[in-house]
């Protein structure tokens, strides 16, 4: 019986799972919407909701706890300066998971996880080297 065992293993070690959720949390904070598999989205939601609650608290200890979890100073800054004040009056339920069909190739169920009342302009913002190269060619 699996009573009392929370979460999924995803065929990864503990360290790999923690790193995966840290990276996914940072990506969700940065873009405010990401596409991933449905089980990963379901396990990511409580991680991100706890981070938003830390951002709402806003004290030094909460900031250090957030840094220990997501390890990205810029995303912690956004968490405490943008997302914390945005959800100050909301008592919970900061994330929404919407099913997004099935992935071509392995038919894995996909989902979109996003913040409720998200900033639509943050989507795709600074999406890595491909977008940086495109912006450099536009400037030239």
UniProtKB/Swiss-Prot annotation:
KW Ribonucleoprotein (keyword) present: yes
The entry's keywords: Ribonucleoprotein, Ribosomal protein
Q: SUPFAM superfamilies from the entry? A: Prokaryotic ribosomal protein L17 (SSF64263)
Q: Does the keyword Ribonucleoprotein apply?
A: yes
> Which molecular function terms from Gene Ontology are attached?
structural constituent of ribosome
Gene Ontology CC, one term: cytosolic large ribosomal subunit
Family assignment from sequence similarity: Belongs to the bacterial ribosomal protein bL17 family.
Name the record gives this protein: Large ribosomal subunit protein bL17
Source species: Methylobacterium nodulans (strain LMG 21967 / CNCM I-2342 / ORS 2060)
């Amino acid at each position: 019986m699996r009573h009392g065992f929370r979460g999924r293993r995803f065929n990864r070690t503990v360290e790999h799972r923690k790193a995966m959720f840290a990276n996914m949390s940072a990506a969700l904070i940065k873009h405010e919407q990401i596409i991933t598999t449905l089980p990963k989205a379901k396990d990511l939601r409580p991680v991100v909701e706890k981070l938003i609650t830390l951002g709402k608290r806003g004290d030094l200890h909460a900031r250090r706890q957030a840094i220990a979890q997501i390890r990205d100073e810029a995303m912690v800054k956004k968490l405490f300066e943008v997302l914390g004040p945005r959800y100050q009056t909301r008592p919970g339920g900061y994330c929404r998971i919407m099913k997004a069909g099935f992935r071509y190739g392995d038919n894995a169920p996909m989902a979109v996880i996003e913040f409720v009342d998200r900033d639509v302009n943050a989507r795709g913002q600074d999406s890595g080297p491909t977008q940086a190269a495109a912006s450099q060619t536009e400037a030239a």
